[in-house]
Amino acid sequence: KEGYIVNSYTGCKYECFKLGDNDYCLRECRQQYGKGAGGYCYAFGCWCTHLYEQAVVWPLKNKTCN
């Protein structure tokens, strides 16, 4: 599974500005989803890879980013 890492309180994606390989995104994806996860910056959001199927990713139901 893949997807944008999301703040469960706000419903917002984690923003990034250095597109492609991005240490911040990799660190955040691994912290939230485990050491096996990958991450990079895609379309100014942190995109996580190698997630377990039940992983929660953006968008969240009933939560809009404000």
Swiss-Prot record:
The keyword Disulfide bond applies. This is Beta-toxin Chui2. GO terms for cellular component: extracellular region. The keyword Iron-sulfur does not apply. Keywords: Amidation, Disulfide bond, Ion channel impairing toxin, Neurotoxin, Secreted, Toxin, Voltage-gated sodium channel impairing toxin. Disulfide bonds join 12-65, 16-41, 25-46, 29-48. Abundance in venom is very low, approximately 0.3%. SMART domains: Knot1 (SM00505). Belongs to the long (4 C-C) scorpion toxin superfamily. Sodium channel inhibitor family. Beta subfamily. Beta toxins bind voltage-independently at site-4 of sodium channels (Nav) and shift the voltage of activation toward more negative potentials thereby affecting sodium channel activation and promoting spontaneous and repetitive firing. It is found in: Secreted. InterPro entries: LCN-type_CS_alpha_beta_dom (IPR044062), Scorpion_toxin-like (IPR003614), Scorpion_toxin-like_sf (IPR036574), Scorpion_toxinL (IPR018218). PROSITE patterns: LCN_CSAB. Expressed by the venom gland.
